């Protein structure tokens, strides 16, 4: 049980469940409960890959900053164990998304979002373009659900998803901003600083609410 909790924590369980719940809610509104549960499960698998790849890549940096809440740093699981489980789950997640309830089109779009999450972990977090994978992935999520139930996603939901995704990106890095700079992680929030990031997040949320409730 302790290992399972450690793997869940390494997958960034809170954000993973938020994304999964959003997918389930959209699917439930558009289709049946069975479809929604199936879609939520496939989305959950993709989020596991993103979270685990993040902790694998950040392992040395987490050690440097003594982030003892991270399972790899705490020693609850080893990096070889996490890598092994990640590589086992990658083909499972790909197959479940392409052959499951999302279908080829919806599954392909969602996997694009998963790819963006992994690309952020390994590359974009160091770039001024760090918001880009968030913008794409958070538009891909609702789009994939719409395609999964044979519906065309409206433009407003794609824009709303992108804006909220970028806002989350700016807020999510605030807690580690100074440590990120020490580690030469130069994403856009790190370059703009704390208060500009908070202000930009607020503006993005306001604009996204306009698109959401203006329909």
Question: What does each of the following model-derived ranges do?
Answer:
Residues 1-215:
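Multi-pass alpha-helical membrane architecture of UbiA-family
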